[in-house]
Amino acid sequence: MIKLKNIEILKYKSFTTPQSINIEEDITVLVGMNESGKTSVLECLAKTNYFEDDEKFKFNETLDYPRKELKSISKSDSKPKAIICTYHISDELIGLIENRLGKGTWQGSNEITLTSSYGDSSTLISGVSINFELFLKHLNLSDIGDDVKTELKLALTEEKFDQILKKFPDETERLEPLRKYFFKSSTWMTFIERYAYSVLIKRHLPKFIYYDEYYQLPSRIILESFLDDDVDLSDDLKTAKALLDLSEINVNELINADDFEDFIAELEATEALISDTLFQYWSANQNLNIEFKIDKKTATVKRQVNTSYGSATTVDTNIVEHVLDIRVKNSKTRVSLPLQNRSKGFNWFFSFLVWFNKIQADSNSKYILLLDEPGLNLHATAQADLLRFLESLVDKYQVIYTTHSPFMVETTKLNRVRTVFSDSDSSIVSDSIQQKDPNTLFPLQAALGYDVAQNLFISKKNLLVEGVSDLLYLTTISEYLNANKRTGLNEDITIVPTGGAE
């Protein structure tokens, strides 16, 4: 119902000048060198509406505002703006709003913007506009006096609404149904626009989930780490917590249990579901499976006791930790190793699926996936598997990922690519794939070069063109002709950009 359409980063870390980035409805790829600002884009976006309460994903003026300009805003009373997000609202959602507030009440367009600022993490919403007269008509209140209408239109809080009821006691019975539209406090222009956003729109607003290599599952997990809810977990333990949550394991019950078989069975059931997905897209080795074991770590303590024969020393054995051990077994070689001792690529893929399954379990929210350098340790063929997996998600999720790997760029979908590079003053993001910086373009050039080599060997009919723009023009024109029942390029012809004479 709501899709992210555009973001404009105003001030964030290496972004010192505003950068507008168009977001695709399915997958958007940020390509650039290390330290170009790719990760900053994902971080800044995640902090606008993160899926859980995490201090790491809240705007921090000291840590996030461009360092060179920090002094200039330190004495200012107003909080600087960080990012503007533009969302597209579907006609279906507008229909739901009008079903609740009255036909024709929505006066805005199909876009709303959310501006996030530093400091109190406040958000300015624009684009929500409700026709007040039609709203009153929907509630059969069109005939109330003009003075009452004026007071209502200016009322923003429930307290002010109560004052109106006291001022117009004869209208109390008719106006009382309006109470549910008011809030305790509000900074909106009208109470009904606040209601439209907070009750009808906000719950459909997608949340962001960020994932990078630091979220990979550890091989050994100390279960006592999860007993204190007030302790901030490290990124890898957050993924471990997601695994336990998916398995519906109560850590307190596990720690106090004498036998762990039931808990291991729950973990194995969850692992089986995740592995079913994993091996659909993991073609490197189909002989791997995950094993779980729960160990008790004990310690001995000596103490003095008094007996009828005098003082004596006794030794107590106490359980100090419960450890969940995660291992990967190769059914072909019959060798098992700790998870972190297997390939980093396999660990990344499995850990990501654990993290991803956590949000899939929440059917009440929509998500946008932010993946920082996904599959960095994957082999080229495994990266192709990862791309297939990401493609399978686009019906339900928008995906934005960063990369500098040529194997994570689909040459047939270059419209998804945004180049990120840094000049002397600011990080810059561009829709153009013809930047002059060769280092920024290297993944694209390498991907196209690989595609050319593959096509020349595999495809029987190749149409050689000068550059990428020619490929895009011809492909677009051909698709347009086909859509209008005219003749486009034959499907067995592969367009191959050669890079020109330069």
Please report, for each region that a protein language model flagged, where it lies by residue.
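Coupling/switch segment of ABC-type P-loop NTPase heads
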Residues: 108-165, 196-285, 306-309, 317-321
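Short linear interaction motifs
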Residues: 96-98, 174-203
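Short, polar loop/linker segments at the starts of domains and inter-domain junctions
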Residues: 19-21, 99-101, 221-237, 427-431
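A general structural signal for short secondary-structure junctions and capping/turn motifs
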Residues: 72-79, 104-107, 116, 197-206, ...
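Switch/communication elements of ASCE P-loop NTPase nucleotide-binding domains
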Residues: 1-51, 266, 270-280, 293-299, ...
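Acidic, Mg2+-coordinating catalytic modules of nucleic-acid enzymes
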Residues: 105-111, 124, 203, 446-464, ...
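Conserved P-loop NTP-binding catalytic core
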Residues: 43-110, 255-264
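Flexible phosphate/Mg2+-sensing switch loops adjacent to catalytic phosphate-binding sites
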Residues: 50-80, 184-194, 292, 367, ...
